[in-house]
Amino acid sequence: MQIALLCEDLNRQSELEAIATRWGLTHDEDNVFALVLTTQQLELRKRDEPKLGAIFVDLVSGAVAHRRKFGGGKGQSIAKAVGLNKGATPLVLDGTAGLGRDAFVLASLGCKVQMVERHPVVAALLDDGLSRAKHDADIGGWVSQRMSLLHASSHDALEQLMAQDDFVQPDVVYLDPMYPHPENKKKSALVKKEMRVFQSLVGADNDADALLAPALLMATKRVVVKRPDYAEWLDNQKPSMAIETKKNRFDVYVNAGMKS
């Protein structure tokens, strides 16, 4: 994929080149999107809209850290959806990892989470944020033990993983496909910015429905699909149950009991 590759710390130029090689990125000077390696982090900028600021993965501070400390623990909806409230600590595969926020919440509650992100730029951002979190004195130990990013950034990532001899099937597959956002629905400024940038970078998630069938084959216990409250069921399949929040719901497709 082509994108502008910029390094603001001359001592890290070789790191940027390694990132480009790892994720199949080539430099395009005129691209409206820039992947920028600063002294602190890897970030994405939309060059024609500088006021939007940069997007980067921060699992150590800010909103993610606040949610880890004060977000409700195993009583929160996402925890119930994956079965944490049933005394189990499932192995979770997050098939649409994005910036890693939901995966981080599940990992902070004890789950081992394998993350898959198919878009190479988003995967590069997530990989950088994960690396920084692993080196953090406070959370680095359990992040290193519980969170991993799988190199599967194509449309049939789930099928590819199932074909690998050493792949361990997860108890739960978690999906949060990007969904068109109606103008009349309120979102935070940060989420609006990220959605706007991602939807123009990644494009519409038109094949999201195709994720459900392989996810159901992969998960030994259940598939959890996060949807906006106004969205239809994924692939028009009715879930076994739904857990609703103010703005979203978690559609749960049960393959087996959590303790079976």
UniProtKB/Swiss-Prot annotation:
Specifically methylates the guanosine in position 1516 of 16S rRNA. Belongs to the methyltransferase superfamily. RsmJ family. Its main location: cytoplasm. Gene3D superfamilies: Vaccinia Virus protein VP39, YhiQ-like domain. It is an enzyme of class 2 (transferase). This is Ribosomal RNA small subunit methyltransferase J. It is found in: Cytoplasm. Keywords: Cytoplasm, Methyltransferase, rRNA processing, S-adenosyl-L-methionine, Transferase. GO terms for cellular component: cytoplasm. Its EC number is 2.1.1.242. It catalyses: guanosine(1516) in 16S rRNA + S-adenosyl-L-methionine = N(2)-methylguanosine(1516) in 16S rRNA + S-adenosyl-L-homocysteine + H(+). One of its GO terms (molecular function) is rRNA (guanine-N2-)-methyltransferase activity. The lineage of its organism: Bacteria, Pseudomonadati, Pseudomonadota, Gammaproteobacteria, Vibrionales. It holds the Pfam family SAM_MT.
